[in-house]
Amino acid sequence: MIALYKYAIKNGADYIFQTDSDGQTNPEEFAAFWQLRDKYDAVLGHRSVRGDGKSRAFVEHVVCFLLRCIFGVKVPDANAPYRLMKASLVDKYIDRLPEDFNIPNIMFTTYFAYYQERITFREISFKPRQGGVNSINIPRIIKIGWKAVGDFRKLKREM
């Protein structure tokens, strides 16, 4: 994902919109995000109701708890796959992340909140998966999570 963000920046994009391709988000909600683009540098989705199961919601709560403990930021949804960001804001933080960093959106949300950028969270609908195969299972989530804690601590020291 980092390479795609860099591609957009390199090619002069003013805004970067990111969403997943598995049909869980609603394209009709984009207009509300677009209307907020002049007021905020990033409009980030917030999934208070999730159609992807309790285990995924639990993982998101753990992530938000870790971000609060490690970075001192309180966000309602760190990794929502529906976000409209000014390319200049992404460019400001992207080089802080390793090229192969697995969860860049979580760190972008963290940086934006930590440095008090002009951001807002907007409720989005989040349906059960409509297509594709769930590539994340509990053992993989634990492995990613364990690595993330180490990565978060390292990135915090660099702030």
Language-model segments: residues:
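Acidic metal-phosphate-binding loop of nucleotide-sugar-dependent transferases
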Residues: 23-24
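Acceptor/aglycone-binding surface of glycosyltransferases and processive sugar-polymer synthases
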Residues: 1-10, 15, 27-102, 129-139, ...
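C-terminal, non-catalytic tails of nucleotide-sugar-dependent glycosyltransferases
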Residues: 147-159
